[in-house]
A protein has these predicted regions:
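Residue-level recognition of single "structural anchor" positions
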Residues: 1-227
């Protein structure tokens, strides 16, 4: 019951905050979380795992049926794309499983990045057509480099570092709830300079500003929320 109440609050916050919009000098990069079916298969009659389970504990005690952990980026990882501009606007969305493609990046930024903005990115090939299709100036930071003149992606890397550290507190989040956690952290970042009393006031008002009609059974049957 506590999970469902918390989920309704986060649903309402997500609806209130929205995906967002960035402009000016923008940094963007993706980060990854392991695909998790936590909460789906326990006592479930209709759920089937799409892979073998990951088991914990000493290697000698692990089952032969355990799925080997893949190296690099695989379909068992969820890509979360984040973008931040210099005025503090944030976009943080689940975009795909595994390696992202141009169509995923295009879907995220369509209608959400101002024309004539400068987008600082890494050398991933998925960004290659953004400058022509979105009328933005692309500044690529090559692998192994920290900056390119005045351009860098240190703010977005720092955001990802804080996000991962914060997510460690939850010991694994089911992928079907991951979008809400991205918005929860986004909310924390947007109002991190507020005093605690103001944060409580904002949380109360904003969580009631948008109506969420999600029922308990909807949480159990929820699908991951990709942009």
């Amino acid at each position: 019951m506590i999970l469902e109440i918390g989920g309704k609050i986060l649903d309402a916050l997500r609806l209130y905050i929205g995906t967002g919009h960035v402009s000016g000098l923008v940094e963007a990069d993706e980060t990854f979380f392991r695909l998790s079916y936590k909460g789906n298969h326990s006592k479930s009659k209709g759920f089937t795992m799409t892979r073998k389970p990951y088991l914990r504990g000493p290697k000698s005690k692990k089952s032969e049926n355990e799925e080997p952990k893949p190296r690099g980026i695989s379909r068992n990882q969820v890509a979360v794309m984040c973008a931040i501009d210099r005025t503090g606007n944030i976009i943080s969305e689940l975009i795909c499983n595994g390696r992202m493609k141009y169509k995923d990046v295009e879907r995220l930024f369509k209608g959400r990045i101002e024309e004539n903005s400068t987008l600082c990115i890494d050398s991933h090939k998925s960004y290659i057509r953004l400058d022509n299709n979105f009328d933005v100036d692309i500044q690529k930071i090559e692998t192994g480099k920290f900056k390119k003149g005045i351009y860098h992606i240190q703010h977005i890397n720092s955001y990802h570092s804080r996000l991962k550290k914060w997510m460690d507190n939850f010991n694994g989040v089911a992928t079907k709830y991951l979008a809400n956690y991205m918005y929860w952290f986004k909310w924390i970042e947007l109002f991190k300079t507020d005093k605690d009393a103001m944060k409580c006031k904002r949380l109360f008002i904003q969580s009631h500003a948008s109506y969420s009609n999600t029922r308990i059974k909807d949480f159990k049957n929820r699908k991951p929320l990709y942009i």
